[in-house]
Curated annotation (Swiss-Prot):
This is Large ribosomal subunit protein uL13. One of its GO terms (molecular function) is mRNA binding. Pfam families: Ribosomal_L13 (PF00572). PANTHER family: LARGE RIBOSOMAL SUBUNIT PROTEIN UL13M, RIBOSOMAL PROTEIN L13. It comes from Bdellovibrio bacteriovorus (strain ATCC 15356 / DSM 50701 / NCIMB 9529 / HD100). Keywords: Ribonucleoprotein, Ribosomal protein. It comes from the Bacteria. The keyword Coiled coil does not apply. Part of the 50S ribosomal subunit.
């Protein structure tokens, strides 16, 4: 018996839709990262993109536990002296709520060339409407907390 190695052109990709309303950011991000990498499939191969497309809706209604809205900070730097900018999670939600889920999922992916390609398969939207109805995404229900 030979070891199976998936090929990128042979992978069938599905579209999933995840409703983030009332869910914790970390719980949504872990499941989205798993689907994006393809670890929920039997044909998972670490060096091949075997993951599916994910549409995350209602990112403006996500929750953070405790005082993370004020305590969690996002940093950016332009590499010029004195240009370190910081933004709290509340400010990020006010500016663009899709940024929070995007950064959470990006942090859960490995840092390599493949992850830069994988993160582009995630689409996040603030409301319930999205332009991907033609792909007929299936609803992904998050498992209940034990």
């Amino acid at each position: 018996m030979k070891t199976f190695n998936a090929k990128a052109e042979e992978v069938e990709r599905k579209w999933w839709i995840v409703d983030a309303a009332g869910q914790k950011v970390g719980r949504v991000a872990t499941h989205v990262a798993t689907i994006l990498r393809g670890k929920n499939k039997a044909i998972y191969t670490p060096n091949v993109d075997t993951g599916d497309f994910v549409v995350v809706i209602n990112t403006d209604k996500m929750e953070l536990s405790g005082t993370k809205w004020q305590d969690k900070k996002y940093y950016s730097h332009t590499r010029f002296f004195g240009s370190l900018k910081e933004m709290t999670a509340a400010q990020a939600k006010e500016k663009d709520s899709t940024f929070i889920i995007h950064e959470a999922v990006r942090g859960m992916l490995p840092t390599n060339k493949l992850s830069r390609h994988v993160i582009m398969k995630m689409k996040a939207y603030t409301g319930a409407e999205h332009p991907h109805a033609a792909q007929k995404p299936a609803l992904f229900t998050l498992p209940s907390k034990k």
